[in-house]
Amino acid sequence: MEINAHNKHLCHLTAASCKPLAIDEKKKAMSEIIEYRPINEDERIEIDQLAAKGLVLIGLQESAESSAILDGIKNYLNNFESSDDEEITDRAYELGSLLGNTIQKHYGWNWFCVEENTDDSFHCVASNKERACCACHEYIYSILTKQHSNNVKLLFNMIKKDYPKEWHFMLLS
């Protein structure tokens, strides 16, 4: 089950039994998108609350520059050494929300809830024309579980203003 899956009509961001998919599983699933929508007000509030916890984790204030936030996330991930599933999932939500909000603020991307034909849903930040996206919670989870290398800063710096017209929610990771 994915990070925010279990109701076809509502995207719940947190649930004790939900864990993010590994990023390679998410890539396979991106071709199965059946519906997507901008996040609602409740989801926005929850993402912002989780991002605020992420800022506390890395010891920064909301006014911090994007580069400082990225350095903080990268350093936190490099030093993270827990194998506790609940702690890993919590950190994925917090740092994933912080990364997504940082991408949103810096590049003008927007948060979306995406539903797949598997009855699962997840949150991502997507480019203005919805051609590219980053499933930030899943991405951070894959780093915390050592399934993906920590290239947070590289990913952030490779984001472009525009992507090929044939792309639709192409997953960046």
Task: Give the location of each predicted region.
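A recognition module on extended beta-rich or small alphabeta surfaces enriched in W/G with H and D/E
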Residues: V125-S173
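Short secondary-structure junctions and interdomain/linker hinges
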Residues: L57-Q61, F80-E87, T102-K105, N110, ...
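Short hydrophobic alpha-helical segments enriched in small aliphatic residues
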Residues: A5-L10, E25
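N-terminal low-complexity, intrinsically disordered segments
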Residues: K26-T89
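Amphipathic protein-protein interaction modules
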Residues: R91-T145
